[in-house]
A protein has these predicted regions:
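Extended alpha-helical targeting/anchoring segments
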Residues: 1-410
C-alpha cells in the first residue's frame, strides 16, 4: 500500500488501516518466526495441519505481543495496556461489549491484503455459556483455576506465513489521521524484517530425559467416587427421558517445569491437527491441537462441523479401511453422530435465514494422525441483522462438549 492509498482510506473514515510487507521465508518455519519475533506475554501462534497430519495447511499466523488486552470475569471487564490495568467496570452483557469493541476496530476490507490482518485473539471459556443461558447462572462451580472467563488480545502486529509460497506478510496497523503514522508503520515493518533475518536464539533447550510421567501422577478435579456416582445419575436421567447424552468432564493436572512452548513443540510433532495454537497470556499459557471447530463465519456463510464417532488409525492401509467400515457400521456411533447433526442444525437455525440451513456433507470419515472421526457439515446463511457474537451465543459450547439437549445436559 502506498501513502496516497493510505491517506484515501483515512478520508473514507477508516482509523485502523493494515500496512503490509511481503518477504521471502523459505528458510524459516512458523515456529522459528514466533521465536524470533513474538516470544513474550500476550503473543500467539496459530497453525494448521491437513487431514492425516502429513502436510501443513497453507497459512499460519504469528501474533506479536499485544499492548492492549481485555479480561472478563463474571460481569467485570478489565482493560490492560502494557501490562497495567487502566480501566475496570461492570457490564450487564460482556458479549455485547466485545461486539462493540470489534465493530469499533474499523478495519477496511482490502482485496490485496492477506486473508487475515488482525483483530481480537484469545479464548472464551466454557463457562461463557452462562452469559447466554439464564438457567445456568445459578449453578456456577468453584473457580479452582482463578483465570478470567474471557481473555482477548488486540492483535495489531502479526505475520501471516504462507507455507505454500514460502513467503511471509508482515502486518502492522496505523491511523491515517495521525501525523507521521505511515512512516512510523514502515519503521515497525523494518524492525520486523531485521528480526526475521536474525538466527533463532537457542533459548528452548529440550529438558534432559527425566522420570516418565505415569497415569497415577495426574490429579483429578473430580475424583473416581464422585465421577462414578454422577455416571449413575446420568443413566437415570437418560432412562427418564430428560437427556439423550451428557458429557461428564474432569480436569487432570500434573506438575510441568519446562518452557510451555516446549509442550506445544511436542504436541505439534506428536499430534498435528487442523487447529493448533499456542497462546501466551503472561501467567497463563494455552496449548491445543484439535480437529474440531465451534463455528465458522465467512462471507455470511455459517458452518458447524460435528465430529463424533471415533476409531484409532490402523497400523496398515488394510486395517485402516477395516476400522473405517467398522466405525460406519457401529449403530451407537452413528446414532450419536446423527444426534449431533440435529443439534448443529438447531443451533445455527437460531441465527440463519429461514430455509437456508442444509447438511452439505454427511457421514464422511476424516483421518488424523492417530484417530479417525465421522464428520458432517452443516451450513446456513446468517441473517442480515445479526453479527458474529450472535453466532457465538447460538453455538456455545460445541455439542460434543455439552450433550443434548444442551441446557438440560449442562
Amino acid at each position: 500500500m502506498d501513502k496516497e492509498k493510505f491517506r484515501q482510506l483515512g478520508e473514507e473514515g477508516f482509523s485502523n488501516v493494515p500496512i503490509t510487507r511481503e518477504i521471502i521465508a523459505d528458510l524459516d518455519t512458523p515456529l522459528s518466526c514466533y521465536i524470533k519475533l513474538a516470544r513474550g506475554p500476550y503473543s500467539y501462534l496459530l497453525e494448521s495441519a491437513a487431514q492425516g497430519g502429513e502436510k501443513w495447511s497453507r497459512y499460519s499466523i504469528v501474533g506479536l505481543p499485544a499492548t492492549k488486552v481485555i479480561k472478563i470475569s463474571g460481569q467485570i471487564i478489565s482493560i490492560f495496556v502494557a501490562g497495567q490495568i487502566v480501566d475496570s467496570f461492570s457490564h450487564r452483557d460482556p458479549l455485547a461489549y466485545i461486539e462493540e469493541v470489534f465493530e469499533g476496530m474499523n478495519y477496511p476490507n482490502l482485496e490485496e491484503m492477506p486473508i487475515y490482518t488482525g483483530g481480537l485473539v484469545g479464548y472464551f471459556g466454557y463457562d461463557t455459556v452462562r452469559y447466554v443461558e439464564n438457567n445456568l447462572k445459578g449453578s456456577v462451580p468453584k473457580d479452582i483455576l482463578e483465570v478470567p472467563d474471557i481473555q482477548l488480545m488486540y492483535s495489531n502486529e502479526l505475520v501471516i506465513f504462507d507455507n505454500v509460497k514460502g513467503r511471509m506478510h508482515l502486518v502492522t496497523h496505523a491511523d491515517p489521521i495521525e501525523q507521521g503514522s505511515f512512516e512510523q508503520a514502515q519503521l515497525r515493518l523494518d524492525r520486523m524484517s531485521v528480526g526475521m533475518a536474525a538466527e533463532v536464539p537457542i533459548t528452548l533447550k529440550l529438558p534432559e530425559e527425566g522420570p516418565e510421567i505415569r497415569e497415577d501422577d495426574f490429579l483429578s478435579s473430580y475424583g473416581k467416587e464422585n465421577f462414578l456416582a454422577d455416571v449413575a445419575r446420568v443413566k437415570n436421567y437418560i432412562l427418564d427421558g430428560d437427556v439423550m447424552q451428557v458429557v461428564l468432564s474432569q480436569r487432570m493436572s500434573a506438575p510441568f517445569e519446562s518452557d510451555p512452548l516446549n509442550f506445544y513443540r511436542a504436541l505439534r510433532s506428536l499430534n498435528p491437527s487442523p487447529y493448533m495454537y499456542f497462546l501466551d497470556l503472561d501467567d497463563l499459557q494455552i496449548v491445543s491441537s484439535s480437529p474440531e471447530i465451534l463455528a465458522k463465519l465467512e462471507n455470511s456463510v455459517v458452518t458447524v462441523r460435528p465430529l463424533a464417532g471415533t476409531r484409532r488409525r490402523g497400523l496398515t492401509e488394510v486395517e485402516d479401511i477395516e476400522l473405517e467400515q467398522d466405525l460406519l457400521n457401529d449403530e451407537k456411533e452413528v446414532a450419536e453422530h446423527l444426534m449431533l447433526i440435529d443439534l448443529g442444525r438447531n443451533d445455527i437455525a437460531k441465527v440463519c435465514r429461514p430455509g437456508s440451513v442444509v447438511v452439505s456433507e454427511t457421514m464422511a470419515v476424516e483421518k488424523y494422525a492417530h484417530v479417525m472421526h465421522i464428520a458432517s457439515n452443516v451450513q446456513g446463511q446468517l441473517q442480515q441483522n445479526l453479527k458474529p457474537m450472535d453466532l457465538l451465543r447460538a453455538t456455545l459450547p460445541v455439542g460434543t462438549l455439552s450433550g443434548a439437549p444442551k441446557v438440560r445436559a449442562m
